[in-house]
């Protein structure tokens, strides 16, 4: 029987053997996963080459600045003093074309467009009596400089309107994204075949989608008045996060048990509520047999079987949690002791709490570089210009080859009314354009791989620092002078390839999830129930696989930081070690998740409540020094404060979570390597020794080594 148990235990590998030379993270190590390291550096060089190629061929000005009918940019170059784009007849845009396409691709709108210094401020329409007058009299003399460039002042107004050289009407407009859009309450002239209601609705939707300029100004004003209060709120979140982690060594035990009792209480109330609902519906005779099958999920709330099923589920959860408290209380105590030890480790190595700033900065670099590449690639190519006329069926237009190439710098001489050489788009025949899709895929792959590598670097560095704390017998005397800096340099020097290997595996799974989401989005309209079910199963499987790989990678990086082995060996050793202690793993993971969730709730909720009462003026006792600013949108600084508090709390608690995981693996290794004798003493704290009923049996002089 005992032999069978030993075989079952060794199914996940043999326990770690005692090594007299082991004193924590190994210093004499060699480079690991060199092939993957070389592959990663070659990929980065290719990523840089893609960036250079995008910079050479790309032109982001077409996204940042609007274009007129000839393809010239507004706001730069010869149009530097004319930053806004005016549409002669914007209703032909909002009623016949895609507005988002207009914003992204330039013209794509059947009306002339001209760069202007300011948008029209009043309504105006050409009157019939002005047809015989000149452009100088009607437009230029009245300071209506809205005609196309080069229109002579002695041209008759009727001729300029027929050739679409000048606008026939103007509306009071507001600039948005560099374009002049009419006010929603402006008086619209009568246009044949178009109702004023449809025009007003189109303008209103257009302004809503592009956002009005005055809202942006108000938001900027709110930030200008409240930025220092937002910084104070973020500072408060930082202090609360740090205090919560440092105080865990004092209150971790009571806090964990209070949280567990709270969860038990919530489940008990849920059972009571479900029973009451079930009893009422049972007395009414409301059964699922009367309802039948329906896609209206809210209807199931009114049948007794729904509440009975919920009652059974909650009762099972309540029973499982009670059994865990009864039979796994020692392991819960071990988890609490490890949480206290993690708080102690963070207190000794305070620099680790600010390492998330390094990770955040590196992530910003990765995301910004990809965004710039994507922008330049999307705007690569030489501009194309073609002949265009508002009505190609008019006399004189039959012989004009519409949609053929032309030069916008040359004068258009034709009897076709309104014929112009306009910007159509960008060529797709260049080097970058032929491979545009492949380059974009390469850039996306680079984004995922570099982000995952940066996150892996942070995990491995923190693991190395905290492992040096655990394996220091005399704490804090034996802790290295710069544990975080040493771990950072050691990781970069020896284990870049291993981090790239783990990041690549995770990246491939994430790319597969993105492809699956893209397929689901494209086929959403034509899916049948079977297809949706299959896609849902695939997405669920990939989600589970990604979670498992993240868990495995995290523990593999801890083993890499300690022993300096390659990724595969480290992942195998970590997995085997965890499987040999699977119950402890589950208990510690859930206790830590519960505690960190409560910590985030405390920090984010506290900052959010204080921000709400302050920015809404509900703290009247504050003096003038701490007077709340008068804001247009008081919710804006509140939301920014809450978001910033969440990011800060997540950064701090991610460090704490990594500390707990590292100390846990070290604790398991300590149990397998050592036996408490003078030659093989335990490195764990006295509280852990006491919980396990173990002690170090050293000589009298050695008993003082543990603090």
Curated annotation (Swiss-Prot):
Family: Belongs to the CTL (choline transporter-like) family.
Membrane topology (Cytoplasmic): 1-33, 249-250, 329-356, 474-498, 579-594, 657-707
InterPro entries: Choline_transptr-like (IPR007603)
Subcellular localization: Membrane; Apical cell membrane
Name listed for the protein in its UniProt record: Choline transporter-like protein 4
Membrane topology: Multi-pass membrane protein
Gene Ontology CC: apical plasma membrane; plasma membrane
Entry superkingdom: Eukaryota
Catalytic activity: choline(out) + n H(+)(in) = choline(in) + n H(+)(out); thiamine diphosphate(out) = thiamine diphosphate(in)
